[in-house]
Amino acid sequence: MKKSFSYNNMLKKNNIFLIGPMGAGKSTIGRQLANQLNMEFFDSDQEIETRTGANISWVFDVEGEERFRDREEKIIDELTKKQGIILATGGGSVKSHITRNNLSDRGFVVYLETTIEKQLIRTQHDKRRPLLRSSSASGNTRDLLQVLAKERNPLYEEIADIRISTDEQNVRVVVNKIIILRKKSSL
């Protein structure tokens, strides 16, 4: 987790950025958090879909992961420049050093953690996640999630202001924890 805060960084903490693996609840929690705090909500994946006119899976399939990540990086750069927003990011967005810096520098970063078991349950019927579509066809979803966790968890931890497990908590409890911990961190 981030270790130091500057006065300038504290001024930028009026944004809340949700990071974590697929199935952690970033979009669901983000919408409710935005509603409760009366802030504008954005989902980076939805922004990509809106701007391309295609779903994430199609963009991923046609353009490839590298081009998708380029789009994602640019959209997150643009969105993180806004003030007073909640942003749910894609699980792989932290692969970009630029994105990690933008998230860390421009807002309060919440790492929503979940276990692979919960990810499997929460994403088992989701056909929109491009990385899962190919792995579920071959029966290697658990293996893929383990590889992604090994690669990405250290990146989530690197920029997180706080970490919250979403495994055994309902959305309202997680939202309230974020609000309380954000207030405590700004004291």
Swiss-Prot record:
Entry binding sites for ATP: G23, A24, G25, K26, S27, T28, R129, Q169
Binding site for substrate: D45, R69, G91, R152
InterPro entries for the chain: AAA+_ATPase, P-loop_NTPase, Shikimate/glucono_kinase, Shikimate_kinase/TSH1, Shikimate_kinase_CS
PROSITE patterns found in the cross-reference section: SHIKIMATE_KINASE
The keyword Methyltransferase is annotated on this UniProt entry: no
UniProt EC number: 2.7.1.71
Pathway per the UniProt entry: Metabolic intermediate biosynthesis; chorismate biosynthesis; chorismate from D-erythrose 4-phosphate and phosphoenolpyruvate: step 5/7
Any one of the GO CC terms: cytosol
Subunit structure: Monomer.
PANTHER family, A to Z: SHIKIMATE KINASE, SHIKIMATE KINASE 1, CHLOROPLASTIC
Summary of the function given for this chain in its UniProt record: Catalyzes the specific phosphorylation of the 3-hydroxyl group of shikimic acid using ATP as a cosubstrate.
UniProt family annotation: Belongs to the shikimate kinase family.
Name listed for the protein in its UniProt record: Shikimate kinase
The species this protein was found in: Blochmanniella pennsylvanica (strain BPEN)
Lineage: Bacteria, Pseudomonadati, Pseudomonadota, Gammaproteobacteria, Enterobacterales
Gene: aroK
